[in-house]
């Protein structure tokens, strides 16, 4: 992407620090993630991925940025944010909620 100067490309990473089988740092530490992307020729910025306003502001910033590089937004998120029994619980990577859990989730998410 950087070689081709795809300056209209924006990648968004949902960086919740978990992989399929556990915490990312325990499997393969890739910190600092933004420096990795920069070393690959991308412009990289970070935001609070649980805050829609933060995401929107950072995307608008990237859209206006004068650069020949592709861009990446690293959105720091909490896995399962907003549902107390799902937050930071990697079991939800594999399973679906039952009816009672769906009801409880909807109440907690106010939907």
Regions found by a protein language model. Give the residues of each.
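Glycine-rich ThDP/TPP pyrophosphate-binding loop and its adjacent helix/strand module
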Residues: 1-111
């Amino acid at each position: 992407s950087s070689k081709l100067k795809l300056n209209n490309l924006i990648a968004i990473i949902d960086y919740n620090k978990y992989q399929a089988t556990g915490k990312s740092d325990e499997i393969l530490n890739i910190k600092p993630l933004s420096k990795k992307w920069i070393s690959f020729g991308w412009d990289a910025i970070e935001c609070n991925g649980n805050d829609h306003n933060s995401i929107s502001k950072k995307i608008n910033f990237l859209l206006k940025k004068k650069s020949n590089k592709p861009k990446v937004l690293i959105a720091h998120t909490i896995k399962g944010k907003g549902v107390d029994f799902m937050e930071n619980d990697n079991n939800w990577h594999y399973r679906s909620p039952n009816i009672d859990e769906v009801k409880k989730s909807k109440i907690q998410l106010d939907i």
